[in-house]
Amino acid sequence: MVWVTVVVQWAHVALAILWVGIAVTVGVVLAPVSAALPLPQQRAFGLRLGKRVGPLFGIAGGGTMLLGILRGTVFGPLHSLAAFTSLYGLTFIVALLLTVAVAILGGGPLGAGAERLYADDALWQVGPDSSLPPALVAAQQRLHVLARWELGGF
């Protein structure tokens, strides 16, 4: 049974590394590079990126949470409600709440906001003076702030 605990523990760690790694790569590397591209290329890149990383975020985030819960309860010391009042139990609860908050932020306003941004044709129409549409700039800034909050949550 010890080997199952080891597998659950390290799969949990590996998925968490993948989750954070994707978020850092997208937020710190790919988003700034994309922002330097012309608008049509930005949009095409964003659409392709979303199709690729969206499922990975779901698998990595969901797997991290599921295996973390299993590691703390089934394969860990939290076998009764009283155990949740221990230092480990309280740490487990705080970690779970923070993880759920990051997952909700990433899957909700950030993920859905990015999907809406790249799907909305009207946002990507450049004005006659070649200026960026204010709604596009506002949406990109909002996503940038949300991405920073997500990274801060990790």
Question: For the regions a protein language model found, what residue spans apply to each?
Answer:
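Polytopic transmembrane helical bundles with strong interfacial aromatic enrichment
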Residues: 1-154
